[in-house]
């Protein structure tokens, strides 16, 4: 006996790729001393800075932005900036990357508090990075 089935209908949904990271430039975790201040820099890629322990200041285009433990900020391409400690020994996590997606405009000049239950995602990124890449020790003079 031949089995006759119904013709199934499938619906295809196009996935919108709102953010496309073309390249990872750097990924590193820095344990800074209490008097640390980086050199001012500018570059043609994005940078995400996350304060993992203690607070830091991000100075961008001359404006000081306090970054508390558990907060992150995006530095847009070609924005002058530097990082400095606030009298304690902070730890920061930095990912710099190339992304030309229009959706990145959403992150211009914003900082975010990362909820405790999402911080593990940043830890997973760092873990994957150390398993995948050779990450040199942090040199504060670079």
Task: Report the location of each language-model feature.
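Generic beta-structure capping elements
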Residues: 30, 51, 95-100, 130
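Hydrophobic residues at beta-strand termini and immediately following loops
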Residues: 67, 95, 114
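Amphipathic alpha-helical segments enriched in hydrophobic/aromatic residues interleaved with Lys/Arg
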Residues: 104-142
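Ligand-binding loop in jelly-roll beta-barrel domains
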Residues: 78-105
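Short acidic-glycine-tyrosine-enriched beta hairpin
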Residues: 62-77
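Short beta->alpha connector loops
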Residues: 55-56, 77-79
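Generic protein-terminus/edge-of-domain signal
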Residues: 1-60, 65-66
